[in-house]
Amino acid sequence: MARPKRTVKKKEKKNVPVGIVHIQATFNNTIVTFTDTRGNTISWASAGQSGFKGSRKSTPFAAQVAAEQAAKRAQDHGMRTVGIYVKGPGSGREAAMRAVNAAGFKVAFIRDITPIPHNGCRPPKRRRV
């Protein structure tokens, strides 16, 4: 018996003038997510998804490309003003912020929300290269 064909609903363009940019910069990758003020994802991009593999994902240029891609998609949804939350110690933090600024967004605020332990978990052992 043949299964009924499923119709795929096309994503509708939401009109979101104000949003939040979450930049998560780890040592291995950078993830840029544009959300509305309630936290619902509008667009996202990462250095790995942008075509960079291996150690090139952790470069500032890869973070810049990822931020530009996510910003372009967010602008298609009508986003103009953003607040920026930055998390993590990675090298792509500044480059991603600069790319968001250069994309033509009005930046309302920039906050660093990197979690800092009050002597929590034991860190991984030091690398000997």
From Swiss-Prot:
Coiled coil: none annotated. InterPro entries: Ribosomal_uS11 (IPR001971), Ribosomal_uS11_bac-type (IPR019981), Ribosomal_uS11_CS (IPR018102), Ribosomal_uS11_sf (IPR036967). It comes from Nitratidesulfovibrio vulgaris (strain DSM 19637 / Miyazaki F). PROSITE patterns: RIBOSOMAL_S11. Belongs to the universal ribosomal protein uS11 family. Keywords: Ribonucleoprotein, Ribosomal protein, RNA-binding, rRNA-binding. HAMAP family: Ribosomal_uS11. PANTHER family: 40S RIBOSOMAL PROTEIN S14/30S RIBOSOMAL PROTEIN S11 (PTHR11759). GO terms for biological process: translation. Pfam families: Ribosomal_S11. One of its GO terms (molecular function) is structural constituent of ribosome. Part of the 30S ribosomal subunit. Interacts with proteins S7 and S18. Binds to IF-3. The keyword tRNA processing does not apply. This is Small ribosomal subunit protein uS11. One of its GO terms (cellular component) is ribonucleoprotein complex. Located on the platform of the 30S subunit, it bridges several disparate RNA helices of the 16S rRNA. Forms part of the Shine-Dalgarno cleft in the 70S ribosome.
